[in-house]
């Protein structure tokens, strides 16, 4: 979203001086329009970020100090503009080609670390910030046999699993083989993870929702996380445990049906899913008496998290909203039954 500029050392590299027109292909949004800096060309954005990242890694070649590179790439987000050499690499269009470009970026980073003899001493974490966006030509991709949300319901912005389940891949030479860990974790857990890894003592108001994954990564134990709060694009919340997911709203809270108030009103005000038995969230079991106690406990937990200003153990942290915004009323107000 405009203005499209590069920011380097806390300053924009050029002042916006022209307008870029929006781009679409087969009804898929490739790029929003808007103001752009003089040195900004959309198709060069991702390659520029890759180049700067590789340069930074090379600059650390002879350093004796640990280095950290946070690389929030623009792909496969809009603007969906794969470089010329990647166009046509897949059969599902620009989005698929852009994903292949990400694969090549990973290849370049690993190759550079290996060349600099740093690979064996580097932890690489690959993740996404959310599920696939439903407005980038998903229906066309599905017709071609590619389902970006896999078996999961919904897309980016939705409260459903398709909006929140992401790849989280950790590579650490000599520590892991080809293995999978099904622990309940979140990207916010990296704050506490890095703190524990570096022996940093967290202050009261630091990482109030973050549980360390270091016991998992170091193979010395498990995360203390028992549940996880999700938030939809419209601010509606859900609470997820290892088996159940309670949604404190009757709709998606994002772009997928049901969205319009008239449609949401057709459904119960809350949704409950057994994520283990029903990972696709097809059956809302909120009225099932067998889960009545679990629902009550999950509502109490959410209320406590809001009142405490945190979902981790520790001193209370004040919210500036008086705990009364619309999306939390359903569990902040005492109600009988479900």
Predicted segments, located by residue:
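Active-site His/acidic residue clusters
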Residues: 2-4, 8-11, 51-98, 133-134, ...
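Loop/turn elements at helix/coil->beta-strand transitions in domains of secreted/extracellular proteins
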Residues: 62-69, 117-124, 165-166, 222-226, ...
């Amino acid at each position: 979203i405009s203005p499209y500029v590069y920011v380097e050392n806390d300053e924009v590299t050029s002042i916006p001086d022209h307008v870029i027109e929006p781009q679409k292909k087969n009804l898929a949004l490739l790029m929003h329009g808007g103001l752009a800096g003089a040195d900004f060309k959309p198709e060069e954005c991702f390659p520029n970020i890759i180049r700067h990242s590789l340069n930074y890694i090379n600059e650390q070649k002879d350093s004796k100090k640990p280095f950290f590179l946070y690389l929030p790439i623009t792909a496969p987000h809009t603007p969906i503009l794969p470089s010329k050499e990647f166009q046509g690499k897949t059969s599902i269009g620009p989005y698929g080609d852009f994903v292949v470009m990400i694969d090549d970026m990973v290849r370049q980073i690993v190759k550079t670390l290996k060349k600099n003899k740093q690979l064996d001493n580097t932890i690489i974490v690959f993740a996404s910030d959310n599920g696939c966006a439903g407005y980038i030509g998903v229906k066309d991709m599905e017709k071609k046999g590619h389902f970006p949300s896999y078996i999961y319901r919904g897309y980016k912005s939705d409260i459903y699993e398709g909006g929140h389940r992401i790849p989280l891949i950790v590579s650490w030479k000599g520590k892991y083989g080809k293995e999978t860990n099904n622990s309940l974790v979140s990207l916010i857990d990296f704050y506490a993870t890095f703190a524990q890894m570096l022996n940093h003592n967290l202050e009261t108001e630091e990482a109030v929702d973050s549980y360390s994954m270091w016991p998992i990564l170091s193979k010395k134990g498990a995360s203390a996380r028992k549940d996880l709060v999700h938030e939809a694009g419209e601010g509606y919340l859900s609470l997820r445990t290892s088996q159940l997911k309670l949604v404190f709203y009757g709709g998606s809270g994002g772009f997928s049906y049901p969205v319009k108030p008239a449609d949401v009103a057709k459904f119960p005000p809350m949704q409950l899913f057994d994520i283990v038995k029903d990972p696709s969230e097809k059956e809302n079991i909120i009225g099932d008496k067998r889960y009545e106690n679990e629902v009550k406990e999950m509502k109490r937990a959410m209320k406590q998290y809001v009142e405490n200003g945190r979902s981790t153990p520790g001193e209370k942290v004040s919210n500036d909203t008086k705990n009364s915004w619309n999306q939390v009323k359903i569990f902040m107000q005492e109600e009988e039954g479900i």
